[in-house]
């Protein structure tokens, strides 16, 4: 366990950072997915946990919170984050590419990140992803620190992810963003004349208000997490 969310079912059960969950009931936990499946499939059902804490096995009882997904299905939620344990060198495989193959791989990865970003924006709009998942500069700084600790390659990948995200967001047709300017140019092309200054000024004001609200919400989410 890397982190226990305050007020969560895990905290109420007594789980702490550094604990290792070894059993749920009589089922041994050899991979994290086994634990998350138990939790997800047993909302509001008491689970008996065997936990390794500093070499001592202790028993805890945890009742997963009930969370309702967008489709109406109810799932359990514990409120813990997994600690990523680095692989030993003998389990690592290093794959290297030539210049042209590397360019292709970079382009393919960028395209995947673009699709993922567009998909997440769409889910935020329709409500499939909760707005409290929106992150701001504090979360970005934390992510940068974690990726930097993992190595240069991970740090550069994180920077690429942020760059792609900002690029896609900048193309949203919202006044004050580049996407808004493109929208005005598109309208101008259709109507054969520029959008009136009054309409543009009003649109910029609305766009700026929306941006400020989103930035404020992202900062609020950041502060509520830390």
UniProtKB/Swiss-Prot annotation:
Molecular function GO labels: metalloendopeptidase activity
Taxonomic lineage of the native organism: Bacteria, Pseudomonadati, Pseudomonadota, Gammaproteobacteria, Enterobacterales
Family the entry assigns: Belongs to the peptidase M50B family.
GO BP annotations listed: proteolysis
Cellular localisation: Cell inner membrane
Record remark on domains: The 2 circularly premutated PDZ domains act to negatively regulate protease action on intact RseA.
Keywords: Cell inner membrane, Cell membrane, Hydrolase, Membrane, Metalloprotease, Protease, Transmembrane, Transmembrane helix, Zinc
Other comment: Regulated intramembrane proteolysis (RIP) occurs when an extracytoplasmic signal triggers a concerted proteolytic cascade to transmit information and elicit cellular responses. A membrane-spanning regulatory substrate protein is first cut extracytoplasmically (site-1 protease, S1P), then within the membrane itself (site-2 protease, S2P, this enzyme), while cytoplasmic proteases finish degrading the regulatory protein, liberating the effector protein.
SUPFAM superfamilies: PDZ domain-like
Pfam families per record: PDZ_6, Peptidase_M50
Protein name per the record: Protease RseP
Subunit structure: Interacts with RseA.
Record function comment: A site-2 regulated intramembrane protease (S2P) that cleaves the peptide bond between 'Ala-108' and 'Cys-109' in the transmembrane region of RseA. Part of a regulated intramembrane proteolysis (RIP) cascade. Acts on DegS-cleaved RseA to release the cytoplasmic domain of RseA. This provides the cell with sigma-E (RpoE) activity through the proteolysis of RseA.
Organism: Photorhabdus luminescens
E.C. number(s) listed in UniProt: 3.4.24.-
């Amino acid at each position: 366990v890397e982190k226990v969310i305050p007020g969560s079912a895990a905290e109420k059960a007594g789980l702490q950072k550094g604990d290792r969950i070894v059993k749920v009931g009589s089922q041994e936990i050899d991979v994290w997915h086994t634990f998350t499946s138990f939790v997800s499939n047993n909302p509001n059902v008491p689970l008996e946990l065997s936990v390794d804490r500093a070499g001592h096995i202790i028993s805890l009882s945890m009742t997963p919170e009930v969370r309702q997904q967008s489709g109406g299905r109810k799932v359990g939620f514990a409120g813990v984050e997994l600690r990523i344990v680095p692989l030993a060198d003998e389990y690592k495989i290093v794959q290297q590419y030539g210049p042209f193959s590397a360019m292709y791989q970079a382009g393919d990865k960028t395209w995947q990140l673009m699709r993922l970003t567009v998909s997440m924006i769409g889910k935020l709009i329709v409500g499939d992803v909760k707005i409290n998942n929106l992150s701001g500069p504090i979360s970005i700084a934390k992510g940068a620190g974690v990726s930097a600790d993992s190595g240069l390659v991970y740090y550069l990948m994180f920077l690429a992810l942020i760059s792609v995200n900002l690029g896609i967001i900048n193309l949203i047709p919202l006044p004050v963003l580049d996407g808004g300017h493109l929208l005005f140019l598109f309208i101008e092309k259709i109507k054969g004349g520029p959008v009136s200054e009054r309409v543009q000024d009003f649109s910029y004001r609305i766009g700026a208000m929306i941006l400020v609200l989103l930035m404020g919400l992202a900062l609020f989410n950041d502060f509520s997490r830390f």
